[in-house]
């Protein structure tokens, strides 16, 4: 049955792969631009971040085809450079950015960005599932538009989320993620930044995560350290929402 996305009758069919940029107008409304130089996808995750330090937010999109206009076998991890005010903030695809073309199996939070090595450029952390489970860390090559995959031995998980955050207050970004791993359906891992390009698995024994859900970091109790909130499904499809202080 034909159906249309509410509010987008002239732009988007619900089964269509989409890429819509909503630009704010002065009167508080938005102008919707279909495709807008962006790759249409389904099962999409997108993150704005400034990869080249020009003070314009760039865009990273993960997704796949939906067997409507694009084969579902085709996966995308695509980087777009914001061309700034001289080009009306139009986005231009960055060729050969270095990301492996695969996506995660859920709709959760498989991308995080942050400067893990203190070089002043924002790096990218990605969870994906393509011929196995993967947690991939990509080093920003000085804002050139190239990202270099780092050889770090993470215990991979999928169907969950990844986060950068300073877990031990040493001023360096650590890594936390939850999801379904090859060992357990309720993986929750913490990797501490060793300040030399490597990470150490220092996961406390009491941490239990979830799949088909999300985990996030926040200082809930105001003690100056990040806490972990994990939500999703566990064994036997139990609904879980643990908080770790």
Model feature map: region roles:
Residues 64, 106-112, 127-129, 159-164, ...:
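Solenoidal tandem-repeat scaffolds enriched in leucines and small polar residues
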Residues 1-9, 55-61, 120-124, 171-177, ...:
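Glycine-aliphatic tripeptides that mark coil-to-beta-strand junctions in extracellular
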Residues 1-4, 44-53, 108-118, 160-167, ...:
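Beta-propeller blade termini
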Residues 15, 20-41, 80-106, 138-157, ...:
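Blade-edge motifs of beta-propeller repeat domains
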Residues 13-15, 65-69, 130-132, 180-184, ...:
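Short glycine/acidic-enriched loop and turn motifs that connect beta-strands
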Residues 1-14, 18-25, 60, 125, ...:
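Intrinsically disordered, low-complexity linker/propeptide segments enriched in Ser/Thr/Gly/Pro
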Residues 18-20, 68, 77, 133-135, ...:
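Structural signal for beta-propeller blades
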Residues 21, 59, 79, 124, ...:
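Hydrophobic strand positions within the blades of repeat-based beta-sheet folds
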